Amino acid sequence: MIRKLVDFAMENRFLVLAAALVLFGWGAISFHQLPIEAYPDVADNYVEIITQWPGISAEQIEQQVTIPLETVMNGIPHVTHLRSFSLFGLSDLKLIFDDEEENAWNRERVLERLAQVSLPPGASPQMGTDWSPVGQIYFFTLHSTNPQYDVMELKSIEDWVVEKNFKAVPNIVDVSSFGGPTREYQVRVDPDKLISYGLSIAQVEQQLTNNNTNAGGSFIESGQQQINIREVGLVRSVGDIANTVITTRSGTPLRIKDIATVSQGPKIRLGQFARAIHREDGTIVDNDDVVSGIVLLRKGADADEALAGIHAKVKELNERILPPGVKVVPFIDRSDLVHYTTHTVLHNLTEGIILVVIVLFLFVGNVRAAIIVALTIPFALLFAATCLNLKGIPANLLSLGALDFGMVVDGAVVMVENIVRHMTNPQNASRKPSEVIREAAHEVQRPVFYAIAIIITAYLPIFTLQRVEGRLFRPMAWTVAFALLGALIFSMLIAPVLSTLLFRNGVREWDNPLMTYSITHYRKAVKSAIKRPAMTVGIGIAGLCLAFMFTYMGAIGSEFLPHLDEGAIWVRGTLASSVGPSEAVALANQGRTLLCSFPEVPDCTSQVGRPDDGTDATGFFNTEYFVNLKPKEQWRPEFHQDKDRLIAAMDRELEKIPGVNWGFSQPIEDNMEEAVSGVKGELATKIYGDDLKVLEQKADEIVNTMHRVRGIEDLGVFRALGQPNLNFEVDREQAARYQINVADIQDAIQTAAGGNALTQVLQ
């Protein structure tokens, strides 16, 4: 079979060359269209359920929301485990699935179970969007030079204009907004007036809700026309709310404005976002309250295509849609990292091709032969790109970096070198070059085929890997296998045909001094090894033992996920769990100022707490910073373009802020680590038990022990306790004496302390 393929290629040379050119062109187009990821998506399939219940303690959230949700969700097919998190006002539940079904199927099953759960009034569960940890592809802020638009106005523009437009971009699943106060109409009731008029909070709430509706009244006929009837009763202004009638006394209406003041104000915030810019002149422009957003890519979608749509939409927003002076300003654009990664890979590939050509010329000693062999590299690369594109597998730095050019050109080297050897043999001088080349190809066709086939077979176990390791290494295995298949096709079919064209006038024999020198010393080494077999075997065993020692005794480090320099730093500061919003924001401002003071940092953002939609399950005890970095060539000499040195210097500066535990990572890397392990960190130790106090005590003991482990830089404990509560216990006998229900008391306390959202005003 192999012989027939070679014969077919030799007999149809122009057809083979035409097919090769078509494959080259197709491969170039496929390489241009091939989705390229900076980082492989290794996260498991998961579905997130976010339940917000404002004002409710973490303990009550756990008992009345999280546990019922866990109970209902247990038993869903293909669920491997559940992760739950209960915070003040928030329950976050993640269901981790295996790879048996598509995530759309998983979401349908979760939605079916979600309809069966019964939760307390006010608790509103919803499924999180279908995105992956590498799906945060575009971070932006809204910037205004128009004094008419303050941060509250920008928040409204973000929620009602920007978010809607970004969601219209194909494969954009959601936009997560962070920062800026949400506008609301606030009715501040005077308790004394409420008592004097004999009213209750419930009565006021009921009338406010009832007086913000529209209704329909069928239609009437007027002449030849039908006129629809609308009863317009929606609230449009502060005056509409203030004039809402609660009740009447002796024929006189009692309005909201008689017992309360009505105004516009900010909703109670769950987090705050800020940004500082380090200008070229050394000055720092700091804005401690900014409206930001994160554009989320649908899981499995093409990031390049989505980013192109985002860039077009941003241009449209800035030029046509947003008010004058308001602009969308990006501070993280995944396309920058993708372009940097692509440039790095292509640069390395180009250098590799040049080095291979030089080495081939030095050892083969023939320029035409070296060119034939070198053509294997672009052909194999473009062939792999075509196959990956057809199979829908995106390329990434790990898969492209795994291409070994020496392995790719191995078969072509054997084929072409044997052809050159036959062509320079004086016995073949009178024969046709095509006959000599065919004979030479037949001579090595089987060894070349089996050698490359064996290498491809060696990658088969990687295709059986599951879950995280499979998603990490399978794209690499596919890329290498396709490239080797392309190299095999080139070596067996195209290389002999090219030889008939380039060697049709024969091959001049050249006494290669480098090869002569290498062969001479190689023969001496082989003879010496054969004469001393015991020593040769002993050296081999000793080398093997040393390799095992370096590998398994810690001399060579190891990591599960590959490290990619993202050109930025992600800093997390963990505060005391009882910290208040004002103190957390003040500490975040200090940290942002210190980080942005480094000349290597062009800008720095900070976020405290969580977004209003609850998509990041954390509290005010958590502060996170995105630290953008200039190109390493612009860093100060003292850091020697070493990111670890810069991080160490930042850590020393941040230690000036007491009571904060600092950790350093990178934006994508941080998301991936949390997705894989379920915690915000590279490595985590989990302790299981029933007593939270004992668990925290043991956690502190483990931390004290780990501090002595060499190589650990950032270490901390995630506290499950420490949030103080002010408990109101209802005296049921006194409540019964005054004929007051417990629910009325709770509603009054909730409204007085945190307010109660009654209805919605559309403007």
List each model region and its residues.
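Transmembrane helices with small-residue packing motifs
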Residues: 21-56, 115-123, 389-396, 462-472, ...
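Hydrophobic transmembrane alpha-helices and their membrane-interface caps
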Residues: 26-32, 48, 354-421, 482
